[in-house]
Amino acid sequence: FHKPDGIAGDLGGGSLELFDVKDRNIGAGITMPLGGLRLSDMAGGSLSKAQKIAREHVSKAKLLDAGRGRVFYAVGGTWRNLAKLHMGAVHYPLHVMHEYEIPFAEAVPYLKKVAKGEAANIDGIHTVSKNRQSLLAFGAIALLEVIERMQPRSVMFSALGVREGYLYSLLPEDQQLTDP
């Protein structure tokens, strides 16, 4: 991200990592067992149980208090698919996901719909592969709980992940600075 200022979250299959980020400085982070696969397993596939589990963990994440009014940066495949679905639903004209941004007031009702298991009824569901659709609701639950607690001004999505970040970190600093 170009000059990030907010809280970043990386949702994997087993965990959700949250950390404060400002420019090139990354603050201390926390890990919660809220990855899509793990959340689904812990809840026995129940969306209502998943919401309770996510709310319990997120309510303890004091780190999110520092994000109020800033940006939440969403990283991870399930969250990328939520962005892709939203882009299809609003008929977003560009096929560029990196730094795609949804204002908080728009993100909440969208995520609530997906978290209820209604993704199949959203225009644009065809953009998400069938084998990825089953985790959309669990990813939406985790993201919804995080942003409702944090109250960011918006959610911004990354087209890249940890792998790309690691490769970027291997570049010499002068080369890193040339890439916005």
Q: What feature does the model see in each segment?
A:
Residues 1-6, 20-180:
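Helical "lid/coupling" subdomains associated with nucleotide-phosphate turnover
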Residues 12-17, 77:
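Ser/Thr-glycine-rich phosphate-binding loops at phosphate-binding pockets of nucleotides
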